[in-house]
C-alpha cells in the first residue's frame, strides 16, 4: 500500500513535451505506481505539472476560488439581486444552503488533496539525491513545491479562519506538512503563518541560484515564454511558482498580518519591474481585437495557472443564462472613460449585461491563463504598507499604477490615511475582478463588502468547516464568533 497513491489522494501526472504549454494536457489516474513514477527525473517533473493541473479544478482555482464563489462573496455580480441565479444563496452568505455547503466542502477537499500531492512529492525528494537530477533541478522542484503548498494553505487560512486582526490565536486549520493517513490537528493562525513563512523563506533560498526567472535573459519578455528543447522544465518559468512569485506571496502574507515587511517584499518585485524583468501592459495590447487581446496583462503576471479550458467554465463572454457572471455596477467601478480595464476588459454579453472578458476564448498565448499573483498587487501592498513611513512614495506608487491603467488624476498630498485606504480598496476592486482576491481584502480590513457596502460580521467572513470535518475529524468551530 505504501507504493500506491489511492483515490483518496489522486496524484495528477502529465507528460513533459517540447512546448511550454503542453503541461496543460494531463491524465489523472486513480492510482499510480509511485516507485515507477519517481524512477526518473521526468517522473518528478510530471508530478509537479500535475499539481498545477490539480489546482485548475473547478472546485478551486478553475472557478470557485477565483471568478466563481469567492468573487460572488465579494459582491461583484448581479447574483446578489437575482434569486434565480444558481449562486444567489452564496451571495447572501447563506452557508447552510445545500449548494453553498457543497461548494465549501469541495473547495476544502480539493485544496487538501492537492496539498497531499505536494507532500507526496516532497517526501520522495527527501529520499532522493540531487545528483539524480539535471544540475539545479532538485532545488528548483523542492522550492517550487514548498511554495505551492504554502500558497494553498494560505488561501484556506484566509477563507476559513478569522482575520489576523480579529483573532490571530484562533485554533482553526490543519497545516499538513507531511504525507500520511493521520488526522492533522487544528493549529492556531499564528502557528500556520509561522509555518507558511518558513516554507516560503526556504523556497526563496532554494530557487534564487537556479531559477531562470531571476537571470538577465528574463529581462527579454520573449524569454518569459520561450522553452529550451534540451530542458523544457527548467526553461518554462514565466507563470510557474518562480522566485518572483514566492517573493510576491511573502508580500501577501505579511500584508495579511499588517507587518511592515510586506513593503520590503513588494518593493523587491517593483524593483524587478524597474530592472526590466516585468513590463506594464500598454494600451495597444489591450485595445487589440478580442481574439488577440492581452486579457490577463501577461507581462505583469508573477504567477498564473495555465488552463486552456478556462473559457468553457467562464460563460460570461456569451452571457445568456443564470450561470453567467454579469458584473454589478460597472459604471461605478470604472467611472473614468479612460480606464483601460473598463474600456477593453469589460463588454456586453448576449443578454445585454456587462461581463468581463478576462477568461474569454482568446486564440493566442495571451489567453487560457488564470492569474494568481500580479504586479499590480505589489503596488497596492507597497502603497498601503509604506504609507505611514513615506506618504509621498505611497501616493506615487498608487498614481503610477493608475497612470498605467489610463487614469491620470493626481492624488492630493494631504490625503488622510483613511481616505487613502479607500482609494486603494476601489483600485484593488478594479484590478482583482475575476481573480478571487477581493473578499480577502474586505475581510482583512473588516470593511463593508462591495460597491453597496454590505455589512458583514466577523463570523460571516469565516467559511464554516465541512460537516464531515467537524463530525469525523474532531474539529472545532469555536473560533467562529459574531
PLM feature spans:
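Bacterial Sec-dependent N-terminal signal peptides
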Residues: 1-29
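Membrane-proximal, proline-rich intrinsically disordered regions
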Residues: 20-71, 307, 409, 448-482
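Aromatic-residue-lined binding/catalytic grooves and analogous aromatic/hydrophobic interfacial grooves
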Residues: 21, 212-215, 243-278, 480-481
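Inward-facing hydrophobic residues that define packing positions of alpha-helical scaffold repeats
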Residues: 48, 115-118, 193, 200, ...
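Hydrophobic-face positions in mid-chain alpha helices that act as interaction patches
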Residues: 218, 222-229, 233-241, 260-375, ...
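Conserved, well-structured interaction surfaces
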Residues: 45, 85-160, 182-190, 205-207, ...
Amino acid at each position: 500500500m505504501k507504493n500506491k497513491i489511492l483515490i483518496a489522494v489522486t496524484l495528477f501526472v502529465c507528460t513533459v513535451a517540447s512546448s511550454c504549454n503542453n503541461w496543460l494536457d494531463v491524465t489523472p489516474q486513480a492510482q499510480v505506481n509511485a516507485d515507477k513514477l519517481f524512477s526518473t527525473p521526468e517522473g518528478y517533473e510530471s508530478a509537479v505539472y500535475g499539481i498545477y493541473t490539480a489546482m485548475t479544478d473547478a472546485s478551486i482555482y478553475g472557478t470557485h476560488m477565483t471568478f466563481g464563489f469567492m468573487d460572488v462573496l465579494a459582491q461583484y455580480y448581479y447574483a446578489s439581486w437575482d434569486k434565480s441565479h444558481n449562486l444567489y444563496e452564496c451571495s447572501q452568505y447563506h452557508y447552510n444552503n445545500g449548494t453553498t455547503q457543497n461548494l465549501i466542502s469541495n473547495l476544502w477537499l480539493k485544496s487538501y488533496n492537492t496539498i497531499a500531492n505536494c507532500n507526496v512529492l516532497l517526501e520522495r525528494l527527501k529520499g532522493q539525491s540531487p545528483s539524480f537530477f539535471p544540475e539545479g533541478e532538485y532545488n528548483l522542484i523542492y522550492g517550487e513545491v514548498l511554495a505551492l503548498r504554502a500558497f494553498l494553505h494560505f488561501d484556506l487560512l484566509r477563507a476559513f479562519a478569522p482575520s489576523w486582526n480579529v483573532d490571530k490565536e484562533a485554533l482553526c486549520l490543519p497545516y499538513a506538512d507531511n504525507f500520511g493517513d493521520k488526522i492533522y490537528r487544528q493549529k492556531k493562525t499564528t502557528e500556520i503563518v509561522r509555518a507558511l513563512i518558513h516554507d516560503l523563506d526556504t523556497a526563496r533560498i532554494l530557487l534564487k541560484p537556479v531559477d531562470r526567472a531571476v537571470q538577465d535573459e528574463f529581462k527579454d519578455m520573449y524569454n518569459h515564454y520561450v522553452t529550451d528543447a534540451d530542458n523544457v522544465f527548467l526553461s518554462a518559468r514565466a507563470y510557474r511558482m518562480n522566485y518572483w512569485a514566492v517573493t510576491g506571496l511573502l508580500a501577501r502574507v505579511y500584508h495579511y498580518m499588517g507587518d511592515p515587511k510586506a513593503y520590503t517584499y513588494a518593493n523587491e518585485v517593483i524593483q524587478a519591474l524597474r530592472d526590466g524583468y516585468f513590463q506594464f501592459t500598454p494600451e495597444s495590447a489591450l485595445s487589440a481585437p478580442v481574439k488577440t487581446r492581452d486579457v490577463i496583462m501577461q507581462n505583469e503576471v508573477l504567477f498564473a495557472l495555465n488552463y486552456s479550458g478556462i473559457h468553457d467554465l467562464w460563460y460570461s463572454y456569451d452571457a445568456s443564462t443564470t450561470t453567467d457572471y454579469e458584473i454589478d455596477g460597472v459604471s461605478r467601478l470604472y467611472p473614468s472613460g479612460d480606464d483601460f480595464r473598463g474600456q477593453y476588459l469589460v463588454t456586453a454579453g448576449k443578454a445585454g449585461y456587462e461581463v468581463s472578458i478576462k477568461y474569454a476564448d482568446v486564440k493566442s498565448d495571451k489567453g487560457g491563463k488564470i492569474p494568481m499573483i500580479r504586479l499590480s498587487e505589489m503596488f497596492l501592498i507597497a502603497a498601503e504598507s509604506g504609507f505611514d513611513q513615506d506618504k509621498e512614495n505611497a501616493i506615487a506608487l498608487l498614481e503610477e499604477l493608475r497612470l498605467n491603467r489610463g487614469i491620470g488624476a493626481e492624488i492630493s498630498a494631504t490625503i488622510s490615511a483613511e481616505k487613502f485606504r479607500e482609494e486603494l480598496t476601489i483600485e484593488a476592486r478594479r484590478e482583482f475582478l475575476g481573480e478571487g482576491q477581493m473578499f480577502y481584502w474586505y475581510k482583512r480590513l473588516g470593511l463593508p463588502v462591495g460597491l453597496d457596502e454590505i455589512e458583514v460580521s466577523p463570523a460571516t467572513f469565516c467559511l464554516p468547516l465541512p460537516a464531515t470535518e467537524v463530525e469525523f475529524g474532531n474539529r472545532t468551530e469555536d473560533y467562529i464568533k459574531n
